Amino acid sequence: LQGPVGPPGDSGIDGVDGQQGPPGPPGPPGQLTLTLSSATHRFPVVDCSALYASGQTTSGVYTLGPGVQAYCDMETAGGGWTVIQRRLDGSVPFNRTWEEYKRGFGDPNGEYWLGNDNIHLLTSQKAYSLRVDLMDWEGQRKNAQYSFFKVSGESDQYRLHTISGYSGTAGNSMSSNKGYRFSTVDRDNDYDGLRHCAQVFGQGGWWYGSCSGSLLNGLYYRGCGNSCPPWQGVVWHHWRGWRYSLKAVSMKIRPW
């Protein structure tokens, strides 16, 4: 007869390790958390300069983060510019409310404003420069570049915290805007005690003092030459004066 089963023996020696499997798919891009006085905002560490450095050298619309698209100028002055404002043909009205300027509006394939929240978050990450490209109705082109450009958050009314280090061919029409808070047709933050500049001059959101030597978000006029309504159009005073409304303008930023 067969006896009972005995106890199990000792474990054998471990076998050799198997081969490492193939690498998994890449994870999502990392994000930078910017902590402001009122809230914590998450914004991807992506702008057009980073895209340019990664090999994206064709100008066009790119995604900077969830729900945020911008036109990237990959050709002008070394490329890598994030366009925060553009006027081309008057197809998008810029007489908008505070909330619209806060969020941004328009189409990055054409005319648009990137949004004050986005502009603030970008320029708070690192030191940025600003380039303004201008074209009149005769096809002449000028530019203004500022080595330092920074916009404060909403708690400070999107103040133009820093704009300095001018160079270029258009004249320095934004020096008078430094330190001023952003105003819109429904939010009067200017320093003019007699007028609401955003309502009286061009109806566009801007950094008004009393009131401004530039207004790139004013009303879009065609065919009025040097006889446009004063301070109502797309104005760069040091180039074409305050009665001339420009045909095309763009504001673009890049870290340095």
For each feature predicted by the language model, list its residue ranges.
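Extracellular/mature segments of secreted proteins
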Residues: 79-84, 204-209, 218-222
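C-terminal helix/juxtamembrane-tail motif
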Residues: 229-256
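Collagenous Gly-X-Y triple-helix motif
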Residues: 1-34
